[in-house]
Amino acid sequence: MARLVGVDLPRDKRMEIALTYIYGVGRTRSQEILEATGIDRDLRTKDLTDDQVTQLRDYIEANLKVEGDLRREVQADIRRKIEIGCYQGLRHRRGLPVRGQRTKTNARTRKGPKRTIAGKKKAR
């Protein structure tokens, strides 16, 4: 099993797919990496040579921000928005959707489970 930037890549998948297991690398970026390093995208992870693994590792570390570094940067950006008090920061602080989605209905993932409020009793 090849290990790149702290992630074990699945052995039986094509390299194009296996690289997407790294946080910060999607399909397009994985294709760019393989093209830049000259590795066939249809090659399986288990068929990689040690030289190819080293080549991939060096390219990713030199050119991309992935895994822990990327997560830290995203968290720092969110913290900065909260500190400066911009609208997006307020939405983050309140645990509401940040990008303009509706909240009258939906947004349950962000808001959490419903908190039922007792309504009026029926008049007789």
UniProtKB/Swiss-Prot annotation:
Family indicated by similarity: Belongs to the universal ribosomal protein uS13 family.
Subunit: Part of the 30S ribosomal subunit. Forms a loose heterodimer with protein S19. Forms two bridges to the 50S subunit in the 70S ribosome.
InterPro entries linked to this entry: Rbsml_uS13_C, Ribosomal_uS13, Ribosomal_uS13-like_H2TH, Ribosomal_uS13_bac-type, Ribosomal_uS13_CS
Source organism of the structure: Mycobacterium sp. (strain KMS)
Keywords: Ribonucleoprotein, Ribosomal protein, RNA-binding, rRNA-binding, tRNA-binding
One Gene Ontology molecular-function label: structural constituent of ribosome
PANTHER family to which the protein is assigned, alphabetical: 30S RIBOSOMAL PROTEIN S13/40S RIBOSOMAL PROTEIN S18, SMALL RIBOSOMAL SUBUNIT PROTEIN US13M
Purpose of the protein: Located at the top of the head of the 30S subunit, it contacts several helices of the 16S rRNA. In the 70S ribosome it contacts the 23S rRNA (bridge B1a) and protein L5 of the 50S subunit (bridge B1b), connecting the 2 subunits; these bridges are implicated in subunit movement. Contacts the tRNAs in the A and P-sites.
Disulfide feature: none
Phylogenetic classification of the source organism: Bacteria, Bacillati, Actinomycetota, Actinomycetes, Mycobacteriales
Protein name according to UniProt: Small ribosomal subunit protein uS13
Superkingdom: Bacteria
